Amino acid sequence: MATPPYPEDEHSRQAYVDQLGLLEEGADEVFEEILAAATSYFQTPIALISILDHQRQWFRASIGLDIRQTPRRDSFCAYAILGKGVFEVADATLDPRFRDNPYVQGEPRIRFYAGAPLATAEGLNLGSLCVIDREPRGPLAERDVAMLEHFARLVMARIHTLRSTNYIDEPTGLYNRLRLQEDVSLRLQRDGALTVIAADLLPLALLNTIIRTLGYPFSNDLMLEARDRIRAELPDFTLYKISPTRFGLLLPRQQQEETESVCLRLLRAFESPVVCRGIPIKANVGLGVLPLADDTLDGDQDWLRLVVSAADDARDRGVGWARYNPPLDQAQQRAFTLLTSLSQAIGTEEGFHLVYQPKIDLPTGRCTGVEALLRWRHPQLGFVSPAEFVPLAEKTALMRPLSDWVLRHAMAQLAQWNARNIPLRLAINVSASDMEDSSFLEEAVRLAKTYDIDLSALELEFTESVLIRDASAVGSVLLRARELGMGIAVDDFGTGYSNWTYLRDLPITAIKLDQSFTRDLAGSPKAQSVTQAVIGLASQLGYRVVAEGIETHDTFHLLQAWGCHEGQGYLIAQPMLPEQLEDWLRR
């Protein structure tokens, strides 16, 4: 049995099949009606709509045949796509190309075959519409050939209808993301270069709030209003809807110098709130710009992700619009890698360890306690600073498990020190998610019972940013912590609002002066005045004052003279492993 050859345009033909997604669709009633009409007209027991990929033929619809696919080498339709007209086989048992075919020798025992190519406007034959009989027949009459070609054209019309439906965003009636991706591919092949612009109108959090409070229909209507604004400002551009809050448009090669002008017009369109059902919604627009060239674009590169990344960058920096920035994208990719690895590390407890930085009583030099600090050695990236991974964790649900890990291991270490008669006060940093409810405190109480630890040896350190989410809820948790005997310290005091009012309203026991107070303290009279005043006022209010970042003897002596209670910093000691800390204490 001969193997059917591939047409000269096989690569383009296969690419078109892939673009249409014809192999992924389910049953279609229109296809089945066309086949029913074909079998009725030609009086055949079998009719098929077949689409060919590189190795197989797939039946998008069939009558008289139960199978969904066959190898391409066994396909009659693989010959039908080689020409422009109807392909006929009067008796397959007499044709050397087919007489040994398994579908001739066995079921469905094909004898007569006639197939009309399913041709695109570009002349690419995607497959065929064929009729099959189990008995030999003579050649089709001219009118019958014309009718078979007519049925094939009906199939192609339906394919294009399905294609159009698949490429439309239903709420807005605009072309969707799939159509944008196809248009980019086709225009790059034709013109060699273009620019993609993504307009993100609302942060996802704001969209979720709108949906939660006003409903999905309102959010759809809001996007319709936004669509109309863009159309009014840029009537000559094809607009695409590429996500719930994002629109896209293309600048052809000859208009790429107009990029800035187009972006400014888009931003101007949303200077005033979008009024939907009488409710004004202020858009927070970020525009991403990505020039593309056919000779530089990596075939595996997700350019849509890149232009969306640029839009997010523009909004985050408050600049309106921004071109794609590879270093920033690499940073975002690294952040994603870290978050993925962080989740795995929490589950396996691999790569984490704690170090402890001493605090001393400034008047006497005696060590009063330690601060537990988390360290992470990534298996591929090496040491990752907590200044990098903790802010990432705080934006996700990983922060609570991470805090629990620190609490669990720090209290276990404190228990070991207690057993060796090394009494220390342990400070642990807590995040906003730790303060949302009492579960973190409940875990601390459970661990204290397990390790026989007095909770008065535990101090919770939080930054002023913790209060931004829900100051009332945080206050309740802190009050409960204080009732349990824990110390409460405001960390990095001076970097936020430094609001003395919340100090009055919360059960604070200590404030930790940020190292911005102590940096270059000896050389700045103004810094000295501010720092001395803060120490004096905090002391009068009954707070223990701890200075961070002490690195010079001059700073140490100034703070000591002004009545600062405690200090920590590299002059005193760097963060250490438990055994190193014990050696330091003995010295």
From Swiss-Prot:
This is Cyclic di-GMP phosphodiesterase PA2567. It catalyses: 3',3'-c-di-GMP + H2O = 5'-phosphoguanylyl(3'->5')guanosine + H(+). One of its GO terms (biological process) is regulation of single-species biofilm formation. Residues 28-157 form the GAF domain. Disruption phenotype: Deletion of the gene affects both virulence factors and the quorum-sensing system, and significantly decreases total bacteria in a mouse pneumonia model compared to the wild-type strain. Residues 192-327 form the GGDEF domain. Keywords: c-di-GMP, Hydrolase. It comes from the Bacteria. InterPro entries: Cyclic-di-GMP_PDE-like (IPR050706), EAL_dom (IPR001633), EAL_sf (IPR035919), GAF (IPR003018), GAF-like_dom_sf (IPR029016), GGDEF_dom (IPR000160), Nucleotide_cyclase (IPR029787), Rev_trsase/Diguanyl_cyclase (IPR043128). Phosphodiesterase (PDE) that catalyzes the hydrolysis of cyclic diguanylate (c-di-GMP) to 5'-pGpG. The keyword Hydrolase applies. GO terms for cellular component: plasma membrane. Residues 335-587 form the EAL domain. The EAL domain contains a functional active site loop (loop 6), which plays crucial roles in stabilizing the overall protein structure and participating in catalysis, and also controls c-di-GMP and Mg(2+) ion binding.
